[in-house]
Curated annotation (Swiss-Prot):
Gene: ORC1
Lineage: Eukaryota, Sar, Alveolata, Apicomplexa, Aconoidasida
Family under the similarity heading: Belongs to the ORC1 family.
Function: Component of the origin recognition complex (ORC) that binds origins of replication and thus may regulate the initiation of DNA replication. DNA-binding may not be ATP-dependent. In a SIR2A/Sir2-dependent manner, binds to and silences telomers and subtelomeric repeat regions (TAREs). In a SIR2A/Sir2-dependent manner, binds to promoters of var genes localized next to TAREs resulting in their silencing.
Protein name: Origin recognition complex subunit 1
Gene3D superfamilies to which the protein is assigned, alphabetical: 1.10.8.60, P-loop containing nucleotide triphosphate hydrolases
Length: 1189
C-alpha cells in the first residue's frame, strides 16, 4: 500500500510579496511565508442545539435558596460573555515529540528525573481541558448535587429509624459529611488551580482503570465526560461517605416539608437517570458543547436573581465557615485583591507569595471553635492536608499531583531560605516540554549547516539566504519547524518587579522549550559565523499568561472601541492569525520539520504524517477576527514588490486603524542585489578613478555620470562632484595625442559611444531585449548625434567663460521639448571636466536648479544655498542675503568658477520678476565668478520679460530646432546598430516621419519603437507594426471625436497645424489660419464657395473651443511690426515724461498697424499636438497636406 499524498492547507491564495517586520526592508514571498493571511480559513461557529433540562435547573435553584452556601458574588464576576484561555485551548491542539523517543514512548521531565510513560492511545480531538470559569461552575454544581443526594439519604434514614436518639446521631453524621464535602470541594478547586499550568500533561499521561474503592469527588475530566450522569456518581459516593464520617450537630430547618420534596426528587432523579443512559449511548458531545452546557447552567441560576440576592445577604456571615484553605486560592481571589494590592500574576514566582498571604489572612480570622480548628490544621500542616487530597485523586491525575505536592512542600518547609530551588521546580512545571541547556547542547552538537547560495542577496553587513541545509536536510522559507527557544527571549512574559526578575534570570537562561514556528528568512553577518533564522512562532501553551492578560484587560474595558487602548504595539500591528510574534534565533537550534494545519478536516485527511510526531493543528484566533488581517492600503504597489526592486515598506495595521495609520513608508537603506551589470560598471569606475583635491572653500566638485542620467533624471536639484567617469578607451586616446589643443573630441566621443553601447548590452542575449533596452529613455550616450552645431556653441561659451573667470556670462537656450537641450549642456560639461582633469582648464563647480521642483520661485535661493554651502538652508530671505553677499564681493578671492544651470526657468517668473532679475544680475558683477545657463521650453520668454531682465539676456541666445525626419532616423539606426535584423528600414522611416510631422520630439520616436518591439516579440518589425504602436500610444477619446468631425473641420485643424510648424509659436494669428484655409479649399476643388462664408468660420471655431481643442487668445505681433518702437509705444501707451517736460497726457490707443497686419485674435492648441495629428493622419486629404508641409 502506497501512502496517501500529503494534503497541505493553502493559507493564502495571492502570490504577493511583503517585507519582513524584523529586518525592515527584506522582501519576502508571501506565497512561501503564508502565515500572515489565511483567506481560506473557515471558522465554524459553536453549535447551539443544546437543551437545558428544567428539572436540573429547578433542583439547583432550590438548593441555592435553601442552603445558601455559594458565594454568588464571585461567580457573577466570571459571568461574562468573553472568550477565555481554556476555551481557546479547545481549538488549538498540541502535539509534541521529545528528544529521546524510543518505541513510541515519551519521557516526561518530573523532579529532575525521567519517567517513561506509555503513549499508545491515539489522541482524541474532542477531549481537551475546559475553561477555568466553566470548571469552577461544574465543581459548584457537583457539590450541590452531592448535597441534594445527601439530603435524600438523610430523609430515608429518618423515615426508617424507630429510635429518636439514633436519629440524632445519624443526623450529626450526615451534617458532618456536608461540611467535609464542602471542604473537599474547595480543595478540589485548589487542585484544579494548581494543575492549570500543567493542563497539557494529559496528552502524555497513560490512562489506567479507575479504582472504585477510593472516595473522592469527580475530577474535571470526569465531569466533562459524564456531565449527563452526575447524579448517579455523586449518590453512590455519598453513601460511602456517610458510613465513614463522624457525627455533628444539624440545623433545625430540616422539616417535614423537606422530606416530601426529597421523595419527589428521588423519583425525578430516577427518570433523569434513564434518559441520561439513552442519550449517553447515542450522543458523543464535544468539548465545546460541554462548555456551552456549563455556561447555560450559569446563566440559568443567575436569572433567578431575586432568590439569590435575598439569600446572599443572609449567607455572608455563614460563608466565613466555608473560607478557602491556604491551598485553595481561586481566580476570583486574584480579581478581588487587585484593587487592594498589585494584581497577582499566574507565574511560578508568586505561588509562595500567594500561599503566605492566605496563611496570614486565615490566622487573623475569628470564627467558631470547630472552624478555627480546621484553619489551624490547614495552616500548620499544609503538606499533610494536601497529601490527603492527592490520595483521593484518580490515578490518571497522579503526575499532576506530584507537581503540586512539590510546590506546597517546598514553600512551607523553607520559608526563610532563598527560593531558587523552589523557583526552578515551579518554573519547569509552568512550561511543558522543557529541556536543560545540557540536553539541547547534546542534540545540536553534531549538527552541520551548509549555506545554499542560490537566490541569496546582500543586506547591510551580511547576506540573506532563502534556504540552508542542516544535517543534509534542506530548510527553506515558509516551512514549519520545531525550534528550541529560551523563555527569557519571550517578549510576552508578564511584567514583574526587578527584584523578582533577578531571582529567575539564571533559571530561565538554562531552560529551553520546543516551540512551533514558520521560517521567514536566514541571515548571516559578515562579522560573525552564526547563521540566524527569522521565525514566526505559533500559539503555544507557554503563552497562557499572555492570553490571560488580554482577558483581564478585556474585562476591564467599558466598550469594545476602547479595547485597543489596553493592547501593546505588538498586538495592535501584528494581529496575526494563529501566531504570536516574529523573532530572530540561532539556526542551529532548529529541531525538525513539521506540518501545521488550520482546519480539522485537512488535519484528519493527512494520514501520512503521524500524530505527535510531525503533525499539528493550529486554529487559534487572538482577537476572533474572521476577515483578512494583513492589509496593504495601496494595491497599485503590489506589482512593484519584487525582490530588490522596491523601496517601500508596509506595516500590518488593523482594519480600524487603517484610515488613521497610513502604512506606506520609505526605507532609507535599500537592498543591494547581486547585479552583474552594476558590478562590471563599478569595477570600471574603480580602475579609472583619480581624486584631485580642489581649493574650493564652500563647494564641492562635480560628479559627472551623464551616461547613466536620463533627460528626466535632472528633476531633483543636487550638487555634483567632479570625478572621473569616462571609459578607458577615451582616456587612452587622449593620452596618445601629443598636442592637447588639437584633440578631435568628436571622433573620440563617437568611439566612446560605441564602447558604451557594447558594455550596456554585454549581458543581454535576446535581440528583442537588446532593442527594447536601447529604446529606453535612460540610455543617453555622451555623444549626441545631429547636435554638433549646438554642442560647439555651448562648448565655446562655457570654455571662454571659465577662462575669463565667469565675468558677465549668461546663455539662454530655448526649444521644443525633446530636442536635446539639457542633454547637450551636460555632455559639454563632461567634456570640460575632462579638460579640467588634464589641467587644460581651471577647476569649476556645477550647480543646478529645476524650476518644476521649486515650490515657490523664492525657494530657488534656498536650493542654491544648500548646494553652495552643503548645509541646511535658512528661510528664503536669509538665503538670498548670504548668497548676494558672496557674489557682490569687492575684492577678488580664490573661489573657483561656478556654473549655474536653471532648467524650466519659465516656472520662476513672478509678477515683479524679482527672482529672475536677481539671478540674471549676479553674473554681471565683477567678482561673482558665476556663469548662468537658462533653459526654457518656450520661444518667447525674453519677450515676456521686463526690460531690465531682457537686457541681461542680450549676451547670448541659442535655439534648438525640432529634430527632422532624417535626423530621427539616424538616431534610431545608431541605437539599433547591434540588432538591425529585427526591424525593417521602412518601419524606421515611417516612425521618424510620423514624429517629425508632429513635434520632432525624439522621446516620442523611442516610445513608438519600444512599443512595437514589445507587441511583436520575436518577429521582425514592419511599417504596419509602427502604425499599431502609434495608435496605441496616442489614441484617445479625443482622437476618435476628431475622426467623426466633418471634412471642413479637419481641414481647418490641418491649416492650424501647418501654421504652427511655420511660425513655431504657441499662439497662431487667426487671420493666417483663415487665409491658409481659403487656399486649401480653392485648390482642392471641393465645397467651392465655403471659403467666403464668415458664419461657417464662427461655427467651426465655436465648436472646436467647446470640445476643448482650441483656445482663443489675444495676439499682438510686436517684433514683426516695428523693431524700432518700444513695447509701451506699440501697445499704445504713452511713455512717461521726464520731470520738467510739459507734454500733454493722451489716451491709450492701439496702434493701427496691428489691425493691418493680422488682427488682435489668436488661436492656441489646448491639447497635445500629437493627438490631433494622429487623428488627422487617418484622413487621406489631411495626411497629404501634413506630409507635404
Amino acid at each position: 500500500m502506497t501512502p496517501k499524498k500529503k494534503i497541505f492547507q493553502n493559507f493564502q491564495a495571492n502570490d504577493n510579496e511583503i517585507l519582513s517586520p524584523t529586518k525592515k526592508g527584506i522582501k519576502l514571498n508571501v506565497s512561501k511565508l503564508n502565515i500572515l493571511n489565511f483567506e481560506n480559513t473557515i471558522i465554524t461557529k459553536e453549535k447551539t442545539n443544546y437543551e437545558y433540562k428544567a428539572s436540573l435547573n429547578k433542583e439547583i435553584d432550590e438548593v441555592l435558596n435553601n442552603n445558601n452556601i455559594i458565594n454568588t458574588h464571585n461567580n457573577k464576576k466570571n459571568n461574562l460573555n468573553l472568550y477565555d484561555y481554556n476555551n481557546i485551548k479547545n481549538s488549538t491542539h498540541e502535539f509534541y515529540i521529545d528528544l529521546n523517543e524510543q518505541n513510541k514512548q515519551t519521557i516526561k521531565y518530573n523532579d529532575n528525573k525521567f519517567t517513561p510513560i506509555n503513549k499508545k492511545e491515539k489522541y482524541n480531538l474532542d477531549e481537551t481541558s475546559s475553561s477555568s470559569i466553566s470548571s469552577s461552575l461544574t465543581n459548584i454544581s457537583s457539590s450541590l448535587t452531592n448535597i441534594s443526594s445527601s439530603l435524600t439519604n438523610i430523609s430515608s434514614s429518618l423515615s426508617n429509624s424507630l429510635d429518636e436518639k439514633k436519629k440524632k446521631k445519624k443526623i450529626k453524621k450526615n451534617n458532618s459529611t456536608i461540611i467535609n464535602i464542602l471542604n473537599n470541594n474547595n480543595n478540589n478547586s485548589n487542585i484544579h488551580h494548581n494543575n492549570k499550568h500543567n493542563i497539557y500533561n494529559k496528552y502524555n499521561i497513560s490512562k489506567k482503570p479507575q479504582n472504585k474503592e477510593i472516595h473522592t469527588l469527580p475530577s474535571n475530566h470526569q465531569i466533562k465526560k459524564k456531565s449527563n450522569n452526575t447524579y448517579n456518581t455523586c449518590q453512590q459516593k455519598m453513601k460511602k461517605n456517610i458510613s465513614k464520617k463522624n457525627t455533628h450537630s444539624i440545623k433545625n430547618n430540616q422539616n417535614d416539608k423537606n422530606k416530601e420534596k426529597n421523595k419527589e426528587k428521588d423519583k425525578n432523579i430516577k427518570k433523569d437517570r434513564d434518559k441520561d443512559i439513552q442519550t449517553k449511548r447515542t450522543s458523543h458531545q464535544s468539548q465545546d458543547q460541554n462548555n456551552h452546557f456549563e455556561r447555560r447552567i450559569l446563566r440559568s441560576y443567575t436569572r433567578n436573581n431575586d432568590n439569590v440576592k435575598n439569600n446572599l445577604k443572609n449567607n455572608i456571615n455563614n460563608n466565613n465557615t466555608l473560607k478557602r484553605s491556604s491551598q485553595s486560592v481561586r481566580i476570583d481571589s486574584d480579581l478581588s485583591s487587585a484593587h487592594q494590592n498589585k494584581r497577582i500574576k499566574y507565574d511560578e514566582k508568586n505561588i509562595i507569595h500567594r500561599n503566605n498571604n492566605n496563611n496570614n489572612n486565615n490566622n487573623n480570622k475569628t470564627t467558631s471553635n470547630n472552624h478555627n480548628k480546621n484553619n489551624k490544621i490547614n495552616n500548620n500542616n499544609p503538606s499533610e492536608n494536601y497529601k490527603k487530597q492527592t490520595d483521593t485523586k484518580h490515578t490518571n491525575n497522579t503526575q499532576n499531583n506530584k507537581y503540586n505536592k512539590t510546590k506546597t512542600t517546598n514553600t512551607f518547609k523553607h520559608p526563610s531560605k532563598d527560593h531558587t530551588d523552589v523557583n526552578t521546580k515551579t518554573f519547569k512545571s509552568r512550561y511543558i516540554n522543557t529541556y536543560t541547556m545540557e540536553e539541547v547542547q547534546k542534540s545540536i552538537k553534531s549538527n552541520t549547516i551548509k549555506l545554499v547560495q542560490e537566490n541569496s542577496c546582500e543586506y547591510q553587513d551580511g547576506i540573506i539566504y532563502e534556504s540552508i541545509q542542516i544535517n543534509d536536510e534542506e530548510y527553506s522559507i515558509g516551512e514549519d519547524v520545531l525550534i528550541f527557544y529560551t523563555p527569557n527571549n519571550n517578549t510576552y512574559n508578564a511584567k514583574s518587579d526587578d527584584k523578582k526578575n533577578q531571582n529567575n534570570n539564571n533559571i530561565k537562561e538554562n531552560i529551553y522549550l520546543l516551540k512551533k514556528g514558520k521560517i521567514s528568512s536566514f541571515y548571516k553577518s559578515t562579522n560573525s559565523k552564526v547563521i540566524e533564522v527569522e521565525i514566526c512562532f505559533y500559539y503555544d501553551e507557554s503563552d497562557e499568561q499572555r492570553i490571560r492578560e488580554l482577558e483581564k484587560k478585556q474585562t476591564s474595558r467599558r466598550c469594545k472601541e476602547d479595547f485597543n487602548i489596553y493592547l501593546d504595539d505588538d498586538t495592535k500591528y501584528y494581529n496575526l492569525l494563529g501566531n504570536i510574534h516574529f523573532t530572530i534565533l540561532d539556526a542551529n537550534y532548529i529541531y525538525k520539520k513539521i506540518y501545521v494545519y488550520n482546519e480539522i478536516e485537512t488535519f484528519e485527511e493527512d494520514t501520512h504524517a503521524r500524530k505527535g510526531k510531525n503533525k499539528f493543528l493550529c486554529t487559534h484566533f487572538i482577537k476572533d477576527k474572521e476577515d483578512r488581517l494583513c492589509f496593504i492600503p495601496n494595491e497599485d504597489h503590489w506589482d512593484n514588490l519584487v525582490l530588490g526592486s522596491s523601496d517601500l515598506y508596509y506595516y500590518f495595521a488593523n482594519e480600524k486603524k487603517l484610515n488613521k495609520n497610513k502604512s506606506l513608508k520609505l526605507i532609507i537603506e535599500k537592498l543591494k542585489i547581486n547585479d552583474k551589470i552594476n558590478d562590471t560598471q563599478a569595477n570600471q569606475k574603480k580602475n579609472n578613478k583619480k581624486e584631485y583635491m580642489n581649493k574650493a572653500q564652500t563647494t564641492t566638485n562635480v560628479k559627472a555620470n551623464t551616461h547613466t542620467k536620463t533627460l528626466n533624471d535632472h528633476n531633483k536639484s543636487k550638487t555634483t562632484k567632479n570625478k572621473e567617469s569616462s571609459s578607458t578607451s577615451f582616456l587612452q586616446d587622449v593620452k596618445k595625442k601629443s598636442d592637447p589643443h588639437n584633440n578631435d573630441f568628436q571622433s573620440s566621443l563617437k568611439e566612446d559611444q560605441e564602447n558604451y553601447y557594447i558594455n550596456l548590452l554585454k549581458n543581454i542575449k535576446d535581440p528583442t531585449d537588446k532593442a527594447i533596452r536601447m529604446m529606453q529613455l535612460d540610455v543617453v550616450p555622451k555623444y549626441l548625434p545631429c547636435r554638433e552645431k549646438e554642442i560647439k556653441e555651448v562648448h565655446g561659451f562655457l570654455e571662454s567663460g571659465i577662462k575669463q573667470s565667469g565675468s558677465n556670462q549668461i546663455l539662454y537656450i530655448s526649444g521644443m521639448p525633446g530636442t536635446g537641450k539639457t542633454a547637450t549642456v551636460y555632455s559639454v560639461i563632461q567634456l570640460l571636466q575632462i579638460k579640467s582633469r588634464k589641467k587644460l582648464l581651471p577647476s569649476f563647480n556645477v550647480f543646478e536648479i529645476n524650476g518644476m521642483n521649486v515650490v515657490h520661485p523664492n525657494a530657488a535661493y534656498q536650493v542654491f544655498y544648500k548646494q553652495l554651502f552643503n548645509k541646511k538652508p535658512p528661510n528664503a530671505l536669509n538665503s538670498f542675503k548670504i548668497i548676494d553677499r558672496l557674489f557682490n564681493k569687492s575684492q577678488k578671492d580664490n573661489r573657483d568658477v561656478s556654473i549655474l544651470i536653471i532648467d524650466e526657468i519659465d516656472y520662476l517668473i513672478t509678477k515683479t520678476q524679482k527672482v529672475l532679475f536677481t539671478l540674471f544680475d549676479w553674473p554681471t558683477k565683477i567678482n561673482s565668478k558665476l556663469i548662468l545657463i537658462a533653459i526654457s521650453n518656450t520661444m518667447d520668454l525674453p519677450d515676456r520679460l521686463i526690460p531690465r531682465c531682457r537686457s541681461r539676456l542680450a549676451f547670448g541666445r541659442l535655439v534648438f530646432s525640432p529634430y527632422k525626419g532624417d535626423e530621427i532616423e539616424k538616431i534610431i539606426k545608431e541605437r539599433l546598430e547591434n540588432c538591425k535584423e529585427i526591424i525593417d528600414h521602412t518601419a524606421i522611416q515611417l516612425c521618424a516621419r510620423k514624429v517629425a510631422n508632429v513635434s520632432g520630439d525624439i522621446r516620442k520616436a523611442l516610445q513608438i519603437c519600444r512599443k512595437a518591439f514589445e507587441n511583436k516579440r520575436g518577429h521582425k518589425i514592419v511599417p504596419r507594426d509602427i502604425t499599431e504602436a502609434t495608435n496605441q500610444l496616442f489614441d484617445s477619446p479625443l482622437t476618435n471625436a476628431i475622426n467623426y468631425l466633418p471634412w471642413a473641420f479637419k481641414i481647418f485643424l490641418t491649416c492650424l497645424i501647418i501654421e504652427l510648424r511655420i511660425i513655431n509659436e504657441f499662439v497662431i494669428p487667426y487671420k493666417k489660419v483663415v487665409n491658409r484655409y481659403k487656399i486649401l479649399i480653392e485648390t482642392s476643388g471641393k465645397y467651392i464657395g465655403m471659403c467666403s462664408d464668415n458664419e461657417l468660420f464662427k461655427i467651426m471655431l465655436d465648436k472646436l473651443v467647446k470640445m476643448g481643442i482650441l483656445l482663443i487668445r489675444p495676439y499682438i505681433p510686436l517684433e514683426n511690426i516695428s523693431k524700432n518702437k518700444s513695447k509701451e509705444a506699440l501697445l499704445g501707451f504713452n511713455e512717461s515724461s521726464k520731470k520738467g517736460n510739459n507734454q500733454k497726457i493722451t489716451r491709450a490707443q492701439v496702434s493701427p498697424d496691428i489691425d493691418k497686419e493680422s488682427g488682435d485674435m489668436g488661436i492656441e492648441l489646448n491639447v497635445e499636438t500629437q493627438l490631433i495629428i494622429t487623428a488627422l493622419m487617418k484622413d487621406p486629404d489631411c495626411s497629404k497636406k501634413l506630409n507635404f508641409y
